[in-house]
From Swiss-Prot:
Protein name, UniProt field: Probable endochitinase
EC numbers for this chain: 3.2.1.14
GO cellular component entries: extracellular region
SUPFAM superfamilies associated with the record: (Trans)glycosidases, Chitinase insertion domain, Invertebrate chitin-binding proteins
The species this protein was found in: Caenorhabditis elegans
Keyword line: Carbohydrate metabolism, Chitin degradation, Chitin-binding, Disulfide bond, Glycoprotein, Glycosidase, Hydrolase, Polysaccharide degradation, Repeat
Length: 617
């Protein structure tokens, strides 16, 4: 996984008690801008049910920030598509307690009920669906995992906190995405962590009467990384299943052109790479002690590409540099499936490697390795033939989830629908299908498999906090968002209020005390600069129950500081003023102030109690 970039829906989100270093993408960054075509609820039909296979799908919370057709939200999910949804990602504090990665994951004024609840509400229409919160990811790094796993005391802090957190928000399990444990110490500590996590989940289930939380992990596919980090015989009994990241075997970080996720080896590449494929990785995990039924094979809905050094040398094994930035993903060498189908519709040539059983496409000097319906079908046949536990996807949002490709024939999720059909007997409808939920979906386990059910009752919030209630369309702004794109709009009756439009729904919001919303600037500013002449009044506040968290109310961004140049995404302190900080997104800087007398701590990248030693230097 590489650190990704993303666009903020609300550029004034403040990282109070959240270390928000930019959106994380498993194994590849993605920032997509396009025209959106939103699909809501749909029904599924069933073909031959094959109930023994697990079909998890990773949901990325930052896909909500994309624009147009590429914007993905939980409501774009189709019932029956997956057996499990893994929410990427949960995060960890320096004291090893867990927290939300993004304020939008939790209920707040501008995001409504929050992504956690929106994802878990999918279980209302997909009654067999299970959800897990995945902790970690590539950009999370290894240091916090290593520190947390180093002692029984610190492991207990994480485990107890994680169990409470996922129960509070209605998840059915915990997924560990440590990329990657390495060395004898990490190997031993990783085993201890997983054993103690499993035991704690069993104890919690016994004391509460709830179904046990699932315990899973995303794991490496490269032989050397497997050997360096995983004591597989001692891990195997404690996992319900593992998610084998059988992709990113080749990418533009190296000049050698190869396949992102080949099923088998190819003689086109040097023999030293013969172990770098799906089959070899899955077999290796099994040979080292992981039961086949617990191995869930990874399926990418994205691809990797190169700019060929010689446009006439198109066979795998040639050389190149990263492919050009694509229209949506905006990261050299990485593309989404819905981009590849457009390339093919616009003249790219598709080739098929009969040995690796995957396609690649060439368009001029651009060479892309990707997966399509044919390679997905071949891999599903392989999973069934070899007896593995199922297949998972990274990610939901890189498939053509809304049938936006010009040659899609209206098929929603053309790649993931292959998994649903071949492993679950579920037929995903075409765009515009009947909007009723399936009465039955594929179950997640068969007799002899570890228990996979974990119906959770969301825990009532433990604390009371005073917040401004997010409301749908108000009387003074009836249908204000009808036909409008997502974004911020002025309140026609009150300069101190403004409206956030999301998916044609409106949310009333208010500026910090004394400020007014500027329709031209699109943020809150002084009354003299706002250009608004409507009488200003403050929005009422109500006391509501919420899950234990910290205040996320922020001050609006001021104008960009000319002297600061954004060289990477993230949060940065302002050396001349401890109360201020800068958020960089795609090379653009946004200025913020910490609220309520707090100061910005450069080490934690949070607003906290004033401490001059923590200010940016």
């Amino acid at each position: 996984m590489l650190l990704g970039k993303f666009l903020l829906v609300a550029s004034f989100i403040l990282p109070i008690a959240y270390t928000w270093t930019g959106a994380t993408i498993r194994n590849h960054p993605a920032d997509v801008v396009a025209a959106r075509n939103k699909i809501t609820s749909r029904s599924v039909a069933r073909s031959e049910p094959t109930n023994s296979y697990i079909r998890p799908c990773y949901f990325t919370n930052w896909a909500q920030y994309r624009q147009g057709r590429a914007k993905f939200v939980p409501e774009d999910y189709t019932p029956g598509l997956c057996t499990h949804i893994l929410f990427a990602f949960g995060w960890m504090n320096a004291d090893y307690t867990v927290r939300a990665y993004d304020p939008a994951d939790l209920p707040n004024d501008w995001a409504g009920e929050g992504m956690y609840r929106r994802v878990n509400k999918l279980k209302v229409t997909d009654t067999q669906l299970k959800t897990l919160l995945s902790f970690g990811g590539w950009s999370f790094g290894t240091a916090l995992f290593q520190g947390m796993a180093a002692s029984s005391a610190s492991r207990k802090v994480f485990i107890d906190s994680a169990i409470t957190f996922v129960r509070t928000w209605g998840f059915d399990g915990i997924d560990i995405d440590w990329e990657y444990p390495s060395g004898a110490t990490d190997m031993a500590n990783y085993v201890a962590l997983v054993k103690e996590l499993k035991a704690a989940c069993e104890s919690e289930a016994g004391s509460t009467g709830k179904d046990r939380l699932l315990v899973t992990a995303a794991v490496a596919a490269g032989p050397a990384t497997i050997d360096a980090g995983y004591d597989i015989p001692n891990l195997a009994p404690n996992f319900d299943f593992i998610l084998l990241m059988s992709y990113d075997f080749f990418g533009a970080w190296a000049s050698l052109v190869g396949f992102n996720s080949p099923l088998y080896a190819t003689t086109e590449l040097p023999a030293e790479w013969n172990g770098w494929n799906v089959d070899s990785s899955a077999r290796y995990w099994n040979q080292k002690g992981m039961p086949k039924e617990k191995i869930i094979v990874g399926m990418p809905t994205y691809g990797r590409g190169w700019t060929l050094n010689n446009a006439s040398a198109i066979n795998p094994g040639t050389s190149g540099s990263p492919a050009k930035i694509t229209q949506y993903v905006q990261e050299a060498g990485v593309g989404a499936y819905f981009e590849f189908c457009e390339m093919l519709a616009n003249g790219a040539t598709r080739y098929w490697d009969s040995q690796s059983q995957v396609p690649y496409l060439v368009q001029g000097n651009q060479w892309w390795s990707y997966d399509d319906e044919e390679s997905f079908a071949n891999k599903m046949a392989y999973v069934k033939r070899e007896g593995y536990g199922g297949a998972f996807v990274w990610t939901l949002d890189f498939d053509d989830f809304n049938a936006g490709c010009s040659n899609s024939n209206g098929q929603l999720y053309p790649l993931i629908s292959v998994i649903a059909k071949e492993l679950g007997g579920v037929i995903i409808p075409k765009k515009g299908g009947v909007t009723t939920a399936p009465t039955t979906v594929a179950t997640t386990v068969t007799t002899g498999r570890p228990p996979m059910t974990s119906a959770v009752t969301t825990t009532t919030a433990a604390t009371t906090t005073t917040t401004r209630a997010a409301t749908t369309t108000t009387a003074s702004n009836t249908n204000v968002c009808s036909g409008k794109s997502d974004g911020f709009y002025p309140n026609s009756n009150n300069c101190g209020l403004f409206v956030l439009c999301l998916s044609s729904k409106s949310y009333s919001m208010s500026c910090p005390s004394g400020l007014q919303y500027s329709a031209s600037l699109k943020y809150c500013t002084t009354s003299t600069a706002s250009g608004c002449s409507v009488t200003t009044t403050r929005a009422p506040t109500t006391t509501t129950k919420s899950a234990p968290t910290v205040t996320t109310t922020t001050r609006a961004p001021t104008t960009t500081t000319p002297a600061f140049k954004c060289t990477k995404d993230g949060f940065f302190g302002v050396p001349s003023d401890c109360l201020k900080f800068i958020r960089c997104v795609n090379g653009i800087s946004y200025n913020f102030e910490c609220p309520n007398g707090l100061s910005f701590h450069a080490d934690t990248m949070m607003c906290d109690r004033p401490d001059p030693s923590k200010c940016a230097k």
